[in-house]
């Protein structure tokens, strides 16, 4: 399967849109010091990872040593978050984990991980939070992500469609906030890779430039090699709820 992607230049910021999961984007698309956004659970290390859940955070945990690190911060980070759920909007309080080890086929890579909760607009409105509060929470969260990446010298930032899908924010709103930040801070984060589900990929592609032309190339597959990417194809069309996962 050929992965569709695109690249555009925003002054000194290079933007790519891919439909792979974040760990794969780390190996295929990242350059230099990399920070990956983990849209993590606010009060539970790894979310429902131990229960076999399958979502962005659980994928990161399954391909790295991230999970035991999160568990070690249960008392000083997660437990203290319990009083600040804010009707499912949560706060900008984040956990920065440097040099997480990722392993794939014997190839070990390091990347910093920013654990920061997505505001859940759909639940917040049910909990009598206003539209204005919901919009501000998303804007503040995205601002925090990019500022943390820039402050820590990240050369590549990998993030998903933060706040979209089940969280209830329109993809256009998320994209506009990101575009504005990049336009106001050109080159502050040199490379941004959006590893997004297929259901949001077209919107990100439209916003961040035309796709690179596909050029057919011969592919040699070793006999008996598993077609892992083929297995992943349909999963990217599914908007998985937090706490429901395959492993």
Label every PLM stretch briefly.
Residues 37, 156-166:
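Glycine-rich anion-binding loop/nest that anchors nucleotide
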Residues 1, 148-154, 170:
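Extended, basic/helix-rich recognition subdomains
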Residues 2-9:
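Short, small-residue-biased leader/transition segments that mark boundaries at the very start
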Residues 108-111, 116-119, 136, 143, ...:
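Divalent-metal-activated hydrolytic enzyme cores
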Residues 35, 155, 190:
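Short acidic/polar active-site loop segments enriched in Thr and Asp
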